[in-house]
């Protein structure tokens, strides 16, 4: 049986291109080797974790690259929803892990992230800022979900910790007739300020200290810097909006876990460290 080499190379041309493109990432392992050597010389015992982390990131990015290539070739809007829901699920689980002492924290985080990011993307698609295609929406959703995940996790953890620290103050306010919202108003404000501050600081310094990923990618891809900043401005605005909606939503969804229907604190929630 004769092997048709032309057909073989045509069918697997994408794989050959991929393997050729991996030469530069492989060369970049030199700096990882440097980090491993420094860790060993300083007795940090991080060599194994460094190698595992880099290997895992390589595997994850390679897999997602092939998945995205497949999705982009389909030109089917349904894949946007599936990819988005998968990202929200992983983000909700991760944020819930950070706020592990909040009952049903993973569901609270997931719903909060879903609310913040879906509202933001819906508005911008409605305004025709981005076309509703996989090539645009999936990368944008990834940036928004990742940012909302961090902010939501910090908000939930900080709110629970602040209420625990000021438990007597909150209980006194409840005893005097305050609602859960009134009794925890200061704690909610503090949690939101702490969680949103990094996002706002990033907006203040964008372009001055570092060039964001979306802008850098477009410039390296050959786009005009002026075109790149237009996209980055939109992305930064979306991140602020999604993070704010997600974090505020999480505070509302946390209350049923913190208080009974009779407006009493669920003391067992705050007893664990």
Swiss-Prot record:
Which tissues show it?
Expressed in roots, leaves, stems, and flowers.
Mutagenesis or variant effect for residue 112 to L: In als3-1; inhibited leaf expansion and root growth in the presence of Al
Record InterPro entries: UPF0014_fam
* Localization: Cell membrane
Expression triggers: By Al, primarily in leaf hydathodes and the phloem throughout the plant, along with the root cortex. Regulated positively by STOP1.
Per UniProt, the keywords (alphabetical) are: Cell membrane, Membrane, Transmembrane, Transmembrane helix
Tell whether Transmembrane is among the UniProt keywords: yes
One BP annotation, GO: response to aluminum ion
- Tell me the protein family, please: Belongs to the UPF0014 family.
- Indicate what this protein is called per its UniProt record: Protein ALUMINUM SENSITIVE 3
Q: What is the scientific name of the source organism? A: Arabidopsis thaliana (Mouse-ear cress)
Query: Species lineage, top-down?
Result: Eukaryota, Viridiplantae, Streptophyta, Embryophyta, Tracheophyta
